[in-house]
Amino acid sequence: MDWLAKYWWILVLVFLVGVLLNVIKDLKRIDHKKFLANKPELPPHRDFNDKWDDEDGWPKKDQPKK
């Protein structure tokens, strides 16, 4: 088991290469054109930032300094 203490990083690299190959293989199976053709319509995004747009605390650029 002395070799495992010395070369554990090789096992980690082999594992990561295997994960990377599986990810690439799975991503090749995805048909992005079919997904984009049948993409569901998203509802409009509601946020309440429009209330704060008028209450901007930044000074105006055209105002002279006091």
Curated annotation (Swiss-Prot):
Q: Which GO terms describe its cellular component?
A: plasma membrane
Keyword Transferase among UniProt keywords: no
Outline the segment boundaries, as ranges, of region: Disordered: 39-66
Question: Can you tell which superkingdom this protein's organism belongs to?
Answer: Bacteria
Q: Which UniProt keywords apply?
A: Cell membrane, Membrane, Transmembrane, Transmembrane helix
The answer to whether keyword Transmembrane helix applies is yes
What topology in the membrane does the UniProt record assign?
A: Single-pass membrane protein
Pfam families according to UniProt: UPF0370
Listed Basic and acidic residues bias regions: 42-66
Q: What is its main location?
A: membrane
Membrane-spanning regions, if any?
Answer: 4-24
Localization, per the record, is: Cell membrane
The record's listing under InterPro entries reads: UPF0370
- Say which family it is in: Belongs to the UPF0370 family.
Q: What is this protein called?
A: UPF0370 protein YpfN
Upper lineage is: Bacteria, Pseudomonadati, Pseudomonadota, Gammaproteobacteria, Enterobacterales
> What is the gene name?
ypfN
